[in-house]
């Protein structure tokens, strides 16, 4: 055998050996990586804690119709469900209802989802809705406003009911967001004195109630098998006598989620070791401008006021940044008001220019204009409830800001009785006032006939009427944008600020925390602890 042939065989054997060894190393490495991945997944699974701890102060009852506790109402959204619910940006979506049709000026027909079961296994039916409306009407429930216009409820069949109203109610469907309770569950007993633990149709059910806590557990029979896998198995609601006690419990790690309107919460829990989400509430403060007033009927004056008032300074100096700057009734996160619109609008020089363009002349320290054959000096009066100290201070700040551009302002501090009469009679020039915005996007209070500012614009009236009729979301957004654009042109009122809500969470809590005024617990079933 030739030497070259021997070397060739040796080389082949050597090459095969290298290939076999390489394959072995790859196999071994893959096995090690797979074992490590399995180990890490096991560890990660072990680290996930599938329960959270909440806090409630001044507990009264878990019954959603009878409770007056705001946080209980918040938590009850996990247990009980309405006909319609809200997304985190306040889009109305079906829940227990399949559809709602307006069949006449004052009548609605609702189809309910009969595939839903109560947490005791019985079927949800339209008679449960009728029962709930009836007990709300008999009670002093916080939901009484939702049903006050319903004059008759007819159960057509197990999946259909017909509601008759006392008149035309814009956006009535938005009132159908109250929790529904089972009629059979309370059959033969007094709902208002029942000692039964309420049942719902939601993702969680009440497992136990004692003097110190309430425990919720996952509803294994919840109707939507296609929903994302629920990570959260149990929720413990700790009951406290005061917010100070709840803050302290959060601080030492016994509470994972705490809702508060107290912007000074850092005094109780410190400034580190937690996460927070601040979001705009529904308490809207604004200046109502009487559009029938001889001065304020001039649109240029109203526009100038909108530019001349520095809301950022008011919120920082008067409210110590405990509120959000606000300019519009829907700027609490409603999808019909886009974030691009958000601006305090302050521009003192533009305010002066608007007055000049509107025919006002500044001389001898005053703005003057001929109106109805007489020369008028631009002097304004702001009426404010004297018991509302912060509003009085804000009015004084506005007075200073308007003085800087040559507008004289007098502050009229009025009593509660005077304030009520001013509202009823619209007997004011400018009124510093406020409202609690509902979840409905209805803007009739500000723009329709009989509104608080004596404002009338035929185009606006048509837009407001159409806004309640159009159901297509794209068209609806277009209409609300036109309403906002016209508002900016006419300025019948000037938004100042709105309250600030805060959700505080422990750093061990994971998941998307997206609180809204409807509920803190949007997609809470996907939360977990580590």
Locations of the language-model features?
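Gly/Pro-rich hinge or "lid" segments in bacterial periplasmic/extracellular proteins
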Residues: 70, 91, 176-230, 234-236, ...
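Surface-exposed binding/hinge segments that line
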Residues: 101-103, 109, 145-187
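Aromatic- and charge-enriched surface segment that lines or borders ligand/interaction sites
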Residues: 98-140, 162, 295
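N-terminal lobe/hinge region of extracytoplasmic solute-binding protein
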Residues: 55-104, 134, 199
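Ligand-site clamp/hinge motif
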Residues: 222-268, 408-410
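Append "and occasionally in soluble cytosolic enzymes with long acidic Gly/Pro-rich linkers
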Residues: 297-399, 482
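Detector for C-terminal structural segments
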Residues: 19, 213, 308-339, 390-399, ...
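A structural "hinge/loop" feature
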Residues: 56-76, 96-97, 122, 172-181, ...
């Amino acid at each position: 055998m030739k030497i070259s042939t021997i070397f060739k065989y040796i080389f082949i054997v050597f090459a095969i050996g290298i290939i076999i060894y390489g394959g072995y190393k790859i196999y071994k490495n893959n096995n090690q990586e797979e074992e490590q991945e399995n180990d890490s997944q096991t560890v990660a699974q072990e680290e996930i804690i599938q329960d959270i701890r909440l806090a409630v102060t001044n507990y009264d009852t878990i019954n959603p119709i009878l409770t007056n506790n705001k946080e209980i109402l918040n938590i009850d959204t996990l247990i009980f469900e309405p006909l319609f619910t809200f997304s985190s940006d306040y889009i109305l979506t079906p829940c227990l209802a399949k559809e709602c049709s307006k069949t006449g000026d004052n009548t609605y027909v609702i189809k309910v989802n009969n595939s839903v079961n109560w947490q005791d296994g019985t079927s949800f039916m339209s008679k449960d809705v009728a029962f709930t409306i009836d007990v709300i009407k008999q009670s002093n429930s916080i939901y009484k406003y939702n049903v006050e216009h319903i004059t008759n409820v007819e159960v057509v069949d197990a999946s259909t009911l017909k509601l008759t109203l006392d008149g035309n109610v814009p956006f009535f469907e938005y009132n159908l967001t109250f929790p529904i309770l089972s009629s059979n569950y309370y059959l033969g007993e007094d709902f208002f004195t029942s000692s039964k633990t309420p049942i719902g149709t939601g993702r969680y059910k009440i497992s136990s109630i004692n003097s110190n806590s309430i425990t919720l557990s996952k509803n294994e029979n919840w109707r939507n098998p296609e929903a994302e896998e629920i990570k959260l198995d149990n929720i413990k609601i700790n009951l406290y006598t005061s917010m100070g006690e709840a803050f302290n419990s959060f601080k030492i790690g016994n509470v994972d989620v705490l809702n508060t309107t107290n912007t000074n919460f850092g005094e109780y829990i410190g400034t580190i070791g937690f996460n927070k989400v601040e979001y705009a509430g529904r308490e809207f403060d604004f200046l109502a401008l009487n559009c029938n007033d001889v001065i304020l009927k001039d649109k240029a004056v109203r526009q100038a006021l909108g530019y001349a008032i520095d809301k950022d300074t008011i919120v920082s100096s008067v409210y110590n940044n405990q509120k959000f700057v606000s300019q519009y009734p829907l700027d609490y996160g409603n999808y019909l008001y886009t974030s691009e619109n958000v601006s305090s609008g302050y521009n003192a020089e533009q305010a002066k220019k608007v007055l000049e363009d509107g025919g006002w002349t500044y001389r001898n320290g005053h703005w003057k204009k001929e109106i109805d054959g007489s020369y008028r000096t631009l002097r304004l009066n702001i009426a404010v409830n004297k018991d509302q100290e912060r509003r009085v201070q804000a009015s004084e700040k506005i007075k200073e800001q308007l003085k800087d551009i040559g507008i004289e302002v007098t502050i009229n501090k009025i009593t509660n009785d005077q304030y009520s009469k001013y509202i009823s009679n619209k007997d004011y020039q400018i009124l510093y006032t406020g409202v609690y915005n509902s979840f409905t996007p209805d803007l009739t209070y500000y723009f329709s006939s009989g509104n608080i500012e004596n404002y009338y614009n035929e185009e606006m009236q048509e837009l407001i009427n159409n806004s309640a009729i159009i159901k297509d979301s794209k068209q609806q957004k277009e209409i609300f944008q036109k309403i906002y654009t016209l508002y900016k042109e006419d300025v019948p009122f000037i938004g100042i600020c709105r309250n600030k809500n805060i959700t505080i969470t422990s750093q061990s809590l994971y998941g998307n925390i997206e609180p809204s005024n409807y509920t803190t617990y949007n997609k809470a079933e996907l939360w977990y602890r580590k």
